[in-house]
């Protein structure tokens, strides 16, 4: 695997020097300063690429070129935003950047309720608490019809939880959910959030798939033409939330994508921490079935709690993800490619890490502190080395 590291640009508290010292050779970044929908010019791409290369690294993957909400709702200037997206792909290819991670999650990107969940060893992790989320949706957001998405016991627990919350607790929970986490290009006030949710009132899973298919049929031929590989990121968490449909959550969703636009430019990001939240997602089977179309991997683990819809981010080699079998399947796919004459390594980043050690005293991006990811990268690197030596050493 090609070892990479997500970097949020010049304002990231983790520097490119830090990235190189961590042992990564590739950088995963994006032009976050360009508003959603606007074209990434060759000049802007080259500026960022030069910064990365001056540090002795390579810009390996774009994460992400965000998709304008008009495209997802098929309203407003969606055709203009698609044309702009096509041009951005052409410009990236012109600059020698050929792997693009993106997602099709409506309104919200990845979602957590607690950004400072304290683990038994004193480090901090990210957590999604189903009951806290229900308390937000039922008692703060007050979304009409939300009760239908929860069991009677969850509704009762959410009411009790909400009753114990201070005003600061409520404000923090609201911020965590709607203000935008790292990599999310949209953040909202509560009123704005309600307005955006309302735009999906008549959009169910089938309708959102129609809109996604329209996007894929416009984008993938351009990607194919210029040699760009599109790698869709799964929904996080991988299930409907807030009354919004989610359509990249299961192996069935992956199969639908391939059948909708059967081009090798239409591929996947294997994010084990997203897909792995669902007990019915067999990650190794996903890799084996769609290995040739996996162009990027996020390797991390989560641990489901007593309520299986509640989870926290576990250490990379622990939790519900069998990281050994996942890495073995990825390495086997790379060797399959090599046997067919390709030296195409799959970029891997350790994804979220725990906030720990000296980083507990620093301001960090949630999930993206340096030391926790350094630990995760080192652990995954060790697993890969052992697999390579045990099964593929001549």
Swiss-Prot record:
The keyword Cytoplasm does not apply. This is Mannonate dehydratase. Pathway: Carbohydrate metabolism; pentose and glucuronate interconversion. It catalyses: D-mannonate = 2-dehydro-3-deoxy-D-gluconate + H2O. Its cofactor is Fe(2+); Mn(2+). One of its GO terms (molecular function) is mannonate dehydratase activity. Belongs to the mannonate dehydratase family. Its EC number is 4.2.1.8. Keywords: Iron, Lyase, Manganese. GO terms for biological process: D-glucuronate catabolic process. InterPro entries: Man_deHydtase, Xyl_isomerase-like_sf. Catalyzes the dehydration of D-mannonate. It comes from Salmonella typhimurium (strain LT2 / SGSC1412 / ATCC 700720). It is an enzyme of class 4 (lyase). The keyword Nucleus does not apply. The gene is uxuA.
């Amino acid at each position: 695997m090609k070892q990479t590291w997500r970097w949020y640009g010049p304002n990231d508290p983790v520097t490119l020097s830090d990235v190189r010292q961590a042992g990564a050779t590739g950088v995963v970044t994006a032009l976050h300063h360009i508003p959603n929908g606007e074209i990434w010019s060759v000049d802007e791409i080259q500026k960022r690429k030069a910064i990365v290369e001056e540090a002795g690294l390579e810009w390996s993957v774009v994460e992400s070129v965000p998709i304008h909400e008009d495209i997802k709702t098929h309203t407003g200037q969606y055709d203009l935003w698609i044309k702009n997206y096509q041009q951005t792909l052409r410009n990236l290819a012109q600059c020698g950047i050929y792997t693009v991670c993106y997602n099709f999650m409506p309104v919200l990107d990845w979602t957590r309720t607690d950004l400072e969940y304290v683990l038994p060893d004193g480090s901090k992790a990210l957590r999604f608490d189903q009951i806290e989320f229900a308390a937000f949706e039922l008692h703060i957001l007050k979304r009409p019809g939300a009760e239908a998405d929860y069991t009677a016991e969850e509704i009762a627990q959410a009411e009790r939880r909400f009753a114990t919350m201070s005003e600061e607790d409520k404000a923090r929970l609201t911020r965590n959910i709607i203000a935008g986490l790292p990599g999310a290009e949209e953040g909202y006030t509560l009123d704005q959030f309600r307005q955006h949710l309302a735009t999906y009132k008549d959009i169910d899973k089938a309708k959102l798939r129609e809109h996604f298919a329209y996007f894929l049929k416009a984008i993938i031929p351009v990607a194919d033409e210029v040699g760009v590989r599109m790698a869709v990121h799964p929904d996080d968490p991988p299930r409907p939330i807030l009354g919004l449909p989610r359509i990249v959550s299961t192996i069935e969703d992956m199969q639908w994508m391939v059948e909708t636009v059967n081009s090798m430019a239409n591929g996947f990001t294997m994010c084990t921490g997203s897909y792995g939240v669902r007990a019915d997602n067999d990650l190794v089977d996903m890799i084996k079935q769609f290995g040739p179309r996996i162009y990027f991997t996020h390797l991390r683990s989560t641990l489901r709690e007593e309520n299986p819809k509640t989870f926290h981010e576990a250490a990379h080699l622990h939790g519900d993800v069998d990281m050994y079998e996942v890495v073995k399947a990825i390495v086997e796919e790379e060797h399959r490619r090599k046997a067919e004459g390709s030296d195409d390594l799959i970029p891997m980043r350790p994804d979220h890490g725990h906030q720990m050690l000296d980083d507990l005293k620093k301001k960090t991006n949630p999930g993206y502190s340096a030391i926790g990811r350094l630990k995760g990268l080192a652990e995954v690197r060790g697993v890969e080395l052992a697999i390579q030596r045990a099964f593929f050493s001549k």
